[in-house]
Amino acid sequence: MSGRDNRAAGAGGGSGGGGGGGGGGGNHHHHHQPLSNAMGKLKEKLTRAGEELGYHRVESNLSASNTATSLDTILPEDPFPFPQAAPQRHPQQQFPFLQQQPQQQQQPQQQQQPQQQQQLQQHHTQHTQYQQQQQQQQPLRLLHDIDDEQPLSFRPLLEDDDIHEPPQEIQQQQLQQQRGNLRASGSLELTPLPPPPTSLEPHRDRQQRSVVNEELQRSKQSLKGSRVSFERAPQQSNSNNNSKNNSKTTVAADASDDDSFEDRRVGYQQQKATSVDHKGILKDLRHILASDNRRQFQAKKHVSLDIKGTPFLQDLLKDSSSEEEFHKTRREFQGRKHQSLDPRVTFKLDKVLHGSSTDSDEEGEDAEHKRLIHRPKDITKPVIIDLKDLESESDEDFLSSRQNFQQQRSISTDSRKSRRLYEMDEMGNKRGENIRHAVPFVRQITEDGKPKLEVYRPTTNPIYIWTQVLAALSVSLGSLVVGFSSAYTSPALVSMTDRNLTSFDVSTEDASWVGGIMPLAGLAGGIAGGPLIEYLGRRNTILATAVPFIISWLLIACAVNVPMVLSGRFLAGFCVGIASLSLPVYLGETVQPEVRGTLGLLPTAFGNIGILLCFIAGTYMDWSMLAFLGGALPVPFLILMFLIPETPRWYVSRGREERARKALVWLRGVEADVEPELKGLMRSQADADRQATHNTMLELLKRSNLKPLSISLGLMFFQQLSGINAVIFYTVQIFKDAGSTLDGNVCTIIVGTVNFIATFIGILLIDRAGRKILLYVSNIAMILTLFVLGGFFYCKANGMDVSNVGLLPLCCFVVYILGFSLGFGPIPWLMMGEILPAKIRGSAASVATAFNWTCTFVVTKSFLDMIKLIGAHGAFWLFGVICCIGMFFVIFCVPETQGKTLEDIERKMMGRVRRMSSVANIKPLSFNM
């Protein structure tokens, strides 16, 4: 029967159930005359055909349908997932004596005729008895129906961030009280309920029903936008009621299957998805994305995900005057959204997960497990990404943070003991397992919104350190040669200008050019090194400098005149310029981020070893023998360079994917999974190729590339204008002018030793303290010592007695070298290989290196002239003022690159926006809309 037929039968045959099957219409003939006429014709036809029993069966079905009410006639379609109504009893279950009737009707007509009258009388008697029994047990049957078909109950509604249970209906309480009294008495003699509505009661017409439906619709519309869940009230078993045991056995089994954990969780996700998109805005996001209007998409998405009444964000986004303000507003909203989606406010997971069939007995007895389920706020806290505090706006950090937040919220909906969220907090105790744990990437916030704890990224691959150390050691031997070449002039010029030790005459001007030509040649080498590392590769370019180094030192050692010495110094300076450019680039592209700072400082440390070696050897050797020693140093450097591979990034830039994979396997270890890193390199290279132009100079002048290039140039400028090379080149002369009682060569050895020790201290601290902290310490140390040195030379120039503080210059030099070697010595070269974008890394590094050697040449060449012009005190004070300016440059311009991948650094430096595909996938939880 349809819903309309049910209503007709319920109105027309209301008294038929109590009065028997004779007159189905009763007193309602004036309301349902067509039904009465049809029933009369049907009775006439069946009686004439000898099938009066069939008429009784039809009339009984109509009587049974009086109490059958479909859910569709009460509540129309609604997007909320209502539970299904209890299954209706089949008429044959109410009339068991009619179940065999179809077989009897299939018998031949001639066999049925002799028994027909007897069967009619027997069935008529049974039917009359059944109707009388049905009338007596009608109140009990109605109560059973109420108990079986439990009324729908609304889940708790959100009101001012609190959860309140709606009050129970008075009628429902009365029914529960009556049921309790019946069960307590255990008697079947029950007081009959009032009969069904009769014709004296006004019939509810279509208009009245439509009014009720409209009220229901309005009430449901008011519920939209809130997190509402519909479920049945808890089932109450009645073991004393034997009349319903057989009918409820199958229903209870089905209910246990339907109430399984997975079904509850899926239903919970569907309800959550429906409640989140309460304004229906997500359906037009595809059209918005097609028009590439990112701000409009963000505004729409935020409003659609806003469930706590913060529509003011849309106006904030419209009023954003700049991109930075827009990002700030969006980050603030993310925090609000994550807090609004926090289970401690919007979910009551204990009710959703109550009665889960997958929970074991062991879990049920676990007090901690129960506490976590019944108090979701103890399971998780909202996790937001404070990109400003972390100094990172990279796509990778954002996605990683979002995935971590989604994972935590997903686990909070899962009551299974094996993946409880509170066990994830033990990650903080495993920080010692790997250096990677020292990289903070998200912060948990407390209820007041202030950062309190740090969460650490779990390790994915073990750091296979030995191959990376071998690679760093191989290229660092080249830096040893560079340091030896830089310090050569300080001890060599003393013996070279001695006519007794030299077969040719060296004037003061020639000596000035011997010391100053190498920085000038380094400028040329830095310019040429950029294209070389792009076309030949990083490793091949470094390898190509070994043989010219040997030739340059042989030219100096075998020189018979000044031009041969200058030629050898120029060739050595050219190789120094190329090596100083390519060494940090190679290490930056081969070493993992966790140890890039430590291994990245090895070239600087070996360079200082070369300086110290040159100072010590210069004490016992003349300039010619010292040059032969310098020619022997590139030999082990040449041998070790054949053992290491090219950088994977350069292979990817040339389309050699298989060679890049082999290089990564060699660097990371055979057991390491290199595919994610390789895919990241290929994706980064693809992005660089899309944005690259054929004109290299135009690439350098792009706004997105100017920022990292300017930072690199600024670091190089303040490194050289701090006066370090002037101090190194003229250490002996400075100590003579200061009137020190120590031998000049001894002072030089002391300075070199301090430089070497300070560099290794920096190696230990750079991946723990960070780049900027070391730059701050370095600046402060240099500023103090330069001003003190200036004061010392000022007092000496004005005739004051400084003999009592004769060791002051040495102490100041030691502190100055210590501060420089901690920060401004190695970090500018290290950060040059980190912050420059991949597509311009070669050309930009060439410009930065050339600029560095230009500053070196200017400072070295003009230092003696500067002393003559403004005095030694004026020169040191000038360097101190420049270091003060450098401090502000570091504070406001230099980013922190500690623990970040090159891709993360590049995205932040270039200010690259997030891809629309990744933005579109940002949802509160990973469910299907």
From Swiss-Prot:
GO biological process: trehalose transport
UniProt entry tagged with the keyword Amino-acid biosynthesis: no
Annotated spans, Disordered: 1-275, 352-371, 398-420
CDD domains: MFS_GLUT6_8_Class3_like
Cytoplasmic face residues: 1-462, 534-541, 591-596, 646-708, 767-772, 826-839, 895-929
Localisation: Cell membrane
Residue ranges, Extracellular side: 484-512, 563-569, 618-624, 730-745, 794-804, 861-873
UniProt xrefs under Pfam families: Sugar_tr
Membrane topology according to the record: Multi-pass membrane protein
UniProt cross-references to PROSITE patterns, sorted A to Z: MFS, SUGAR_TRANSPORT_1, SUGAR_TRANSPORT_2
GO MF annotations in UniProt: sugar transmembrane transporter activity; trehalose transmembrane transporter activity
Keywords: Cell membrane, Glycoprotein, Membrane, Phosphoprotein, Sugar transport, Transmembrane, Transmembrane helix, Transport
Transmembrane portions of the chain: 463-483, 513-533, 542-562, 570-590, 597-617, 625-645, 709-729, 746-766, 773-793, 805-825, 840-860, 874-894
Biased composition (Low complexity): 85-141, 168-178, 237-254
Entry GO terms, CC: plasma membrane
Modified residues (Phosphoserine): S320, S321, S322, S392, S394, S917, S918
Ranges of Polar residues composition bias in the record: 60-72, 402-413
Biased composition (Basic and acidic residues): 41-59
Composition skew (Gly residues), residue ranges: 10-26
Glycosylation sites: N500
InterPro entries on file: MFS_dom, MFS_ERD6/Tret1-like, MFS_sugar_transport-like, MFS_trans_sf, MFS_Trehalose_Transporter, Sugar/inositol_transpt, Sugar_transporter_CS
Function field: Low-capacity facilitative transporter for trehalose. Does not transport maltose, sucrose or lactose. Mediates the bidirectional transfer of trehalose. Responsible for the transport of trehalose synthesized in the fat body and the incorporation of trehalose into other tissues that require a carbon source, thereby regulating trehalose levels in the hemolymph.
Cited PANTHER family: FACILITATED TREHALOSE TRANSPORTER TRET1-1-RELATED, PTHR48021
Family to which this protein belongs: Belongs to the major facilitator superfamily. Sugar transporter (TC 2.A.1.1) family. Trehalose transporter subfamily.
Identification of the protein by name: Facilitated trehalose transporter Tret1
Species, as recorded: Drosophila grimshawi
